[in-house]
Amino acid sequence: MSTCGDNSKIFQDIQNFIQDYDLNKDYSVTSSEIYQSFLKKMNGDSLKASQAAGVLCSTVDMDNDGKFSYYEISKYCADQAKKQIEQNAETAALADVEALLLRLDKDKDKKLNKTEFVKFFKEQGYNPYSDPDYVLKIIDLDKDGYVSASELQEWFKQKRLAYARGPIC
């Protein structure tokens, strides 16, 4: 799933990819053009250009025909955008967890016990009498009765990814 913003970014990435590598401006990108582009960018170092072109070609040219279809380029750009979103969510989740543990982890064991978790539960705007045990069970993946830093990080990451998906276009 992607958002409207993701789609326009991916479209721009596709246009940039074609602009960067379509040397003869025929709106078609070939493995030869990829190699020539890298050769120019790497000041004539044919070994490095060959290696870089090989990696990119093996990643993008799914049918190994030496040509990059619009579908292949768009899939590559969409995959790159997805990886970036996931990396950003992971980094932000880590920062969220560190801030949360600094504030709520009174015994400094890098996990929240039930008392600490109920405080977190209240801060999130949940009614503490509704069912903190239910939410604890959802976040507590290993079911040890504590919410560890890694469990919190995964939970925050999934919430951020869900938010990043936003409305579907």
UniProtKB/Swiss-Prot annotation:
Binding site for Ca(2+) 2: D140, D142, D144, Y146, E151
Signal peptide extent: none
SMART domains (alphabetical): EFh
Residue ranges of every copy of the EF-hand domain listed in the record: 9-44, 60-83, 92-127, 133-162
Amino-acid positions noted as binding Ca(2+) 1 in the UniProt annotation, renumbered to this chain: D105, D107, D109, K111, E116
Repeat among keywords: yes
Pfam families listed in its UniProt record: EF-hand_7
Example of a GO cellular component annotation carried by this entry: cytosol
The keyword Calcium is annotated on this UniProt entry: yes
PROSITE patterns: EF_HAND_1 (PS00018), EF_HAND_2 (PS50222)
Gene Ontology MF annotations: calcium ion binding
Keyword field: Calcium, Metal-binding, Repeat
PANTHER family in the record: CALCIUM-BINDING PROTEIN (PTHR10827:SF85), RETICULOCALBIN (PTHR10827)
Name of this protein: Calcium-binding protein G
Lineage of the organism: Eukaryota, Amoebozoa, Evosea, Eumycetozoa, Dictyostelia
Name of the gene: cbpG
